[in-house]
Each structure stands twice: as structure tokens, then as C-alpha cells.
Amino acid sequence: MALKAILFLGLFLVVIVSPITVYGGAVCPASSTFGRGSFPDGFLFGATTSAFQHEGAAEEGGRGSSIWDSFTLKQHSESNNNLDGRLGVDFYHHYKEDVQLLKKLNMDAFRFSISWSRIFPHGKKDKGVSETGVKFYNDLINELIANGVTPLVTLFQWDVPQALEDEYGGFLSDRILEDFRDFAQFAFNKYGDRVKHWVTINEPYEFSRGGYETGEKAPGRCSKYVNEKCVAGKSGHEVYTVSHNLLLAHAEAVEEFRKCGKCTGGKIGIVQSPMWFEPYDKKSTSSPSEEIVKRAMDFTLGWHMEPITHGDYPQAMKDVVGSRLPSFTPEQKEKLKGSYDFVGINYFTSTFVAHTDNVNPEKPSWEADSRLQLHSNNVDGFKIGSQPATAKYPVCADGLRKVLKYIKENYNDPEIIVTGNGYKETLEEKDVLPDALSDSNRKYYHMRHLMALHGAVCEDKVNVKGYFVSSLMDGLEWEDGYKTRSGLYYVDYGHNMGRHEKQSAKWLSKLLEKVPDTIQSKVDSDSRKEL
């Protein structure tokens, strides 16, 4: 274990300390060292938060409850854990100082989500609008723009108003399409004159699987044979219904966006959450490795990319899932096709994948349908990537490059924004502040992924326009609670939610420094001499 740690640290030092000369091409400029100047002009660098994870102020300004309020309260009361997500990190009251953190990081952009129930407390416009909630996002957007930071706004990041969940089951019902469309239209009309980058749905794969297949996320529905904690749900069925309605809701919002006069010049997209898959056994003769990887991509990324690009689900899913997979009408297919200006990608890690026939047809599930088995090691014992002891998943930056290239080749070479990429680590209560701030592994993670991204943009010519760190600061990591941290800034939950700069933030701020044109011209000239 000690040797492994030394090797990991050694590799980290080589990557971080050694100067990296980057030679440009048709897409990217040459630069003497790796940094902001290595990427094309206008490339956006930003950081993220989300409403439920960070805002707090759950009962202020007339905000209504969401399914995540209910879910975390239930989990908190049953297990006495630290999962009361209503606390967030009080971004609601600290947003002005948090915008200054973005400036200190030399960030160009900030991605955040709107809490549906903070705007429409009962989920519906005709049941009342919270003007306090409307003002909060208005003030936040103005504060960002006044400080030279571009807002990228997500409409739905998993927090369905509890009122709609109670009324008709949220995304289990197509009744939500009209309510989501009204919410989207309202947001576009209020903020579209200043917000020019919009996301409809964040990670439909994660929301539908976690909430309606495994029960690990709100609203916690699944079959007992999947998760004993679930008290309601139907795995292998509801997951497909919810995904179907998410896609249709996305299309409704995009159609509304296209009509929005204030939104002229803006762009809208959806955020996907793909992993990359490597074959567990490349020498297997029973199941070709290419077919397994393609099936894995179809059941994850393709599930929600094929419909919005080509108008229907992947054939591999239709063949296996059959009647449990809802069908699109001809009109819905036309509305879905091409319903995005960019694709957002949240990427965190990769895995090995193998075919399995070990499924029970009497217990339907997405996992059984996919016939996929995931492994951290391949058949020869090699790991997919390095994984420090506290890390939530292996560091596999090359997977980001492969995912981006896959999207370019399979989905009409779209404009892409890496809307989330971050290192999550679980810290014990005994970990003190100085240890948490010394996050060298997070620096290593982001450097490796930025280098992989550079390869995708500059060598593979993937049309990537931006990179967002997930996240700006620590917050509620959904079902993992507050012990798992992913921020560039440490949040001291026990002392007034104080923000503390981690080493990764200092490093990234330096990396993203804007070089004056006169200095950059000399750098470019010197770089050409080296050639």
C-alpha cells in the first residue's frame, strides 16, 4: 500500500511540477507551458453548484418543499446520519462572496440550477409565484454579470416540487410535461435577456436510475429485490417511464426556448453523465469486446442521446426491454430530433465491463436488461486507473477523451461543454482542516483531465467549448451526505459555513491566469522558435 502511494505521488509530481510545452495546430494555439493559453480563444472555464446541494434557506422566501427535502429528512430520521440536505452550504445568503471566489479562481463562467419550488412553491404557476425566489436568481445573475462571470443555468437538477410528486407522481406522469414547460417558459422570460446558456435536464440517467431503479436517490422508489429499503416502486418499469417523460419534458422546454424573444442569441442543451467502458476481457470469444462496449454506451449515454439526436431509443434497448420501453409518437420523434444546441457532459470516471447471463427474468431491472457487469479490474488484474484511499472512484482521465471522441463520431459532431468534472473524496470526522485543504490528489485529478481534454480538442478536433469544475465548494453530495467533499473550497459546516481555499483552488487560479496580449505574443513567438 505504501509503495502504491509513493508511485501515485511520484506521478502527481511529474505532472504538476514539470513544465509542459504545448504545440498548437489548426485549433489550439502554441504555448510555452500548459494553462489557459493552451486552449482556443473563447474557451470557457467555470465551476458549478446546484440548488439543493448548496443553497440552503429551505424555508425562506416562500420556497416549497422538493422530493429531496422529503428524501433526506426521511433518511436523516431513520439512520441519524448527516443527510439533512435542507441546510446546503447557505449559498442563498453567501452568493455575493461566493461570486468573488469565482473571480479569485479566474473563472469565466458559473453553472448553477434554479430550484423549481423556490419559484413555483406548489410546482404550478397558477398556484402562486414566489417573487422572493424570482428576485434571488435575478440578483445572482446580475451579480455574476457585474463581475464578468457568464451564467450557465440548469432548469432541473433533480428537485421535483413535492406538491407535484404528491399530486400525480412527478415524472412518473406525463402531466408533468405541461408544468415543466410553464416553469421553463417563466424562467426564459425572466432571465433570458441575460442568460445565454441554458440546460434543460441534468443527468437524466442518474435521476431515473437512482430514483426509480435502485432507490438510492430521491424519491427512493424501487422493487424490494433491488433494495430492501424501498417501500414503493417497480424496478425495470418505472425507470423507463421516468426517462421517457424527462426526454419529452426536455423537448417541450427547447420548443419554448425557440419561441422566446428575450433568448435571442442564446443556446440550450441537456447534460449527460457518461462513463467510459473498457472491455473486461479483450480476448473473450463468447462476447466480442466491441459489442459489449457499444451495448454499455447504448444503455447509458445512448439511452438519452439517441432520441434527441435521431428521434428514437437505441435498437439494442428496444430489442431487449420490449414493451416496458415506452414508444415515441411520430410527432414526438420530430420534436426530439436535434433538440439541442450543445451537449453538456458530466464525466468522473471509467470502468471495465463484461457480458453476463446471470439474470433472473422474474426480477426485471435495468441491470438485467443491459446484461452488463462492471469491474474495477480487468481479467488480468489491471486496474482501470489509480485510486487514492479516500477517493470515491478511480482517476481515469483518458476516459474523458474517449467519451468526447465517441460523441463526436456517433452524434453528428455536436458542440460540447464539459459541464462537470471533479474529484470526490470521503473524509472522516477526525480529519482536521489543514489536512482537508492539502488536496494534492484533486490537483492531480484536474490536471490529468485538462490534459486529456486538450488532446480531445486540439488533436481529435472535438468541438468542446468549455470545462466546468465540479464543484466550486463542498456541499451535500446527494445520498452520500456531507462527508464526501468535491469542492475547490472547503466548507466548515460547524463554523458558520466558512469557506477555505484548498490547494487545488490556488493551483487552478494560477493555471487560469489570463495572459496579456503582449506577453502572449512573445510566448507564441518563442514557441514557434522552439519548433
From Swiss-Prot:
Pfam families: Glyco_hydro_1. Keywords: Disulfide bond, Hydrolase, Signal. Disulfide bonds join C222-C230. Residues 1-24 form the signal peptide. GO terms for biological process: carbohydrate metabolic process. GO terms for molecular function: hydrolase activity, hydrolyzing O-glycosyl compounds. The active site is at E203 (proton donor). It comes from the Eukaryota. GO terms for cellular component: endoplasmic reticulum. A beta-D-glucoside binds at Q53, N202, E203, F348, E477, W478. InterPro entries: Glyco_hydro_1, Glyco_hydro_1_N_CS, Glycoside_hydrolase_SF. Gene3D superfamilies: Glycosidases (3.20.20.80). Belongs to the glycosyl hydrolase 1 family. This is Probable inactive beta-glucosidase 25. The gene is BGLU25.
